[in-house]
């Protein structure tokens, strides 16, 4: 909402003959005594203007021209802050626009004509999805939803790690269990995949082929069968929490020779070598990151001839640039912290604009019950499984709990709290606010003939009580919260904001009688409730949680 102040302040600077490259900063004070909005522009410019900041602030205020009925007063505070106090009339007139825009409230055309790719989950198809991957999946999905509100042409991509040593180990693990199922005595390697799901895949192969594969040297049938079954399972798990991708990029394509006889991986090595950043020693091929100030060079091809993760990752990101996206967002787990800077350095060396690539790294997840760490799985190996978490707490709680803390913070997922039907549970608290409004509107329609068609929305201008104005003012923050969440790649900002909306609404509901108020005030408060419901619904859509109409 502060956007309406910006042109007025800039015009005042022009009228005062002040030219500056410094951006005008407008903030929302935490203490309402300091206004609805505040700017420190006079403090920022006092030195270069050689003026006392309070005197400069007074001059700028004298040059400010606002439309009638928008700003109640302007004050100079402290060393030179300019504080703006809006009129209740202007706030409530602005709330009317929420009702007019409906589902589109908070959306913009900032990304119109631009394309963005968000890569998230990208788990190896070597086992069921873990809770840690689930957190990254929800984070990425919410970031994609945020970008969608700004009009970007969006690609939601899953990088399918179907090459490399881990896939070989998967195939070997299934073959060992298959041989065991055929009655052969084996010693199962500790380094291989231990989960019960490996036995289940082996059983499928046994039912189809009986013992005919027991002496087969063809590892592919074991690996490919496991890969197909596991990846199908991964997709089903993600769908349970409404995560779907529209693009899947297979890692193995980076190893396939193209028309010139070179693979994408080969091309990376050639390009980096042409820039003087490749050397070969100790039997391996190295990325000379010491030339970039790092302590050690990084292996791109091991002495065994197998590429390290860095080489195909660089090739994959070069492909993203080849596809000419305007914005590239990667959502990684904390295990990528050491690796992705090398990918960025390689892209810079090869002449690509890395400012268009942004990385969101989410920290680890621990599940707890009564403060004690627990494992979600006792059956399928030593892992916390996402499916079992969803079974236990449901899809909505799974999604919201994953993003209610900053991605930069370790998350303690409190299982008991996620199942509580009380205001202590943030999912329940948010959804209860929405359900309460729906119930109120049903009763109002039955008892007072209220119709949410907008014909009485102008009566919002009659509202002047503090809980009403504060709720309306909070609703007007929604578009800015979206922009902030995108800028920080932090959907948690949306969770915090919606919690504030719910909190403000519950206060308004308790302190301002609605159904028993005079007809005009009743109608106005119902429309304020309707606007609140719209903001909650729009926010729930971004977060990917349901909006129940009764609880």
Swiss-Prot record:
Chief place of localization: cytoplasm
Keywords from the named record: Aminoacyl-tRNA synthetase, ATP-binding, Cytoplasm, Ligase, Nucleotide-binding, Protein biosynthesis
Where is this protein found?
Answer: Cytoplasm
Query: What Gene Ontology molecular function terms does this protein carry?
Result: arginine-tRNA ligase activity; ATP binding
CDD domains given in the database record:
Anticodon_Ia_Arg
Sequence motif 'HIGH' region, location on chain:
123-133
**InterPro entries to which the protein is assigned, alphabetical:** Arg-tRNA-ligase, Arg-tRNA-synth_N, Arg-tRNA-synth_N_sf, ArgRS_core, DALR_anticod-bd, Rossmann-like_a/b/a_fold, tRNAsynth_Ia_anticodon-bd
Q: Which Gene3D superfamilies match?
A: Arginyl tRNA synthetase N-terminal domain, HUPs, Isoleucyl-tRNA Synthetase, Domain 1
Q: What's its catalytic activity?
A: tRNA(Arg) + L-arginine + ATP = L-arginyl-tRNA(Arg) + AMP + diphosphate
**HAMAP family in the record, alphabetically?**
Arg_tRNA_synth
Family (UniProt): Belongs to the class-I aminoacyl-tRNA synthetase family.
Protein's name according to its UniProt entry? Arginine--tRNA ligase
Q: What is the lineage of its organism?
A: Bacteria, Pseudomonadati, Chlorobiota, Chlorobiia, Chlorobiales
């Amino acid at each position: 909402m502060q956007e309406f102040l910006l042109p007025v302040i800039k015009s005042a600077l022009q009228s005062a003959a002040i030219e500056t490259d410094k951006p005008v900063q407008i903030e929302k004070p935490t203490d309402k005594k300091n206004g609805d909005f505040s700017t420190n522009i006079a403090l920022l410019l006092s030195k270069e203007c050689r003026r006392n900041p309070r005197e400069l602030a007074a001059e700028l205020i004298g040059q400010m021209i606002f439309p009638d009925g928008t700003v109640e007063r302007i004050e100079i505070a402290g060393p030179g802050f300019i504080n703006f106090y809006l009129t209740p009339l202007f706030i409530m007139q602005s709330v009317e626009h929420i009702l007019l825009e409906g589902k589109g409230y908070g959306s913009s055309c900032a990304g119109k004509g631009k394309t963005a790719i968000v890569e998230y989950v990208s788990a190896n198809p070597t086992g069921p999805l873990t809770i840690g991957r689930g957190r990254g999946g929800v984070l990425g999905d919410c970031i994609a939803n945020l970008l969608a509100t700004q009009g970007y042409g969006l690609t939601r991509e899953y990088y399918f790690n179907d090459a490399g040593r881990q896939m070989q180990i998967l195939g070997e693990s299934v073959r060992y269990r298959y041989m065991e199922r055929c009655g052969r005595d084996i010693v199962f390697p500790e380094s291989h995949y231990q989960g019960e799901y490996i036995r289940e895949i082996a059983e499928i192969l046994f039912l189809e082929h009986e013992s005919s594969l027991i002496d087969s040297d063809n590892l592919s049938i074991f690996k490919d069968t496991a890969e197909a079954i596991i990846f199908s399972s991964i997709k089903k798990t993600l769908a349970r929490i409404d995560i779907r991708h529209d693009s899947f990029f297979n890692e193995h394509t980076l190893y396939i020779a193209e028309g010139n006889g070179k693979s994408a991986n080969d091309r990376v090595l050639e390009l980096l070598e042409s820039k003087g950043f490749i050397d070969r020693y100790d039997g391996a091929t190295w990325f000379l990151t010491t030339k970039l100030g790092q302590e050690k060079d990084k292996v791109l091809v091991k002495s065994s001839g197998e590429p390290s993760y860095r080489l195909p990752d660089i090739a994959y990101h070069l492909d993203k640039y080849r596809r000419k996206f305007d914005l590239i967002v990667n959502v990684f787990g904390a295990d990528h912290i050491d690796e992705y800077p090398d990918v960025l350095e390689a892209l810079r060396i090869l002449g690509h604009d890395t400012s268009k690539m942004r990385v969101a790294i989410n920290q680890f997840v621990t599940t707890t019950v009564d403060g004690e760490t627990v494992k979600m799985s006792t059956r399928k190996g030593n892992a916390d499984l996402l499916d079992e978490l969803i079974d236990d707490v449901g899809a909505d709680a799974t999604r919201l709990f994953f993003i209610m803390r900053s991605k930069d913070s370790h998350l303690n997922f409190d299982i008991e709290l996620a199942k509580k039907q009380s205001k202590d549970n943030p999912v329940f608290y948010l959804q209860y606010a929405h359900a309460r409004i729906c119930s109120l509107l049903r009763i109002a329609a039955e008892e007072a003939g209220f119709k949410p068609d907008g014909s009485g929305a102008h009566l919002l201008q009659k509202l002047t009580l503090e809980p009403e104005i504060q709720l309306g003012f909070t609703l007007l923050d929604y578009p800015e919260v979206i922009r902030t969440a995108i800028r920080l790649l932090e959907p948690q900002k949306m969770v915090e904001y919606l919690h504030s909306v719910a909190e403000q609404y519950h206060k308004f509901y308790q302190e301002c009688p609605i159904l028993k108020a005079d007809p005009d005030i009743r109608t106005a408060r119902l429309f304020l409730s309707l606007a609140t419901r719209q903001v909650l619904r729009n926010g729930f859509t971004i977060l990917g949680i349901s909006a129940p109409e009764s609880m």
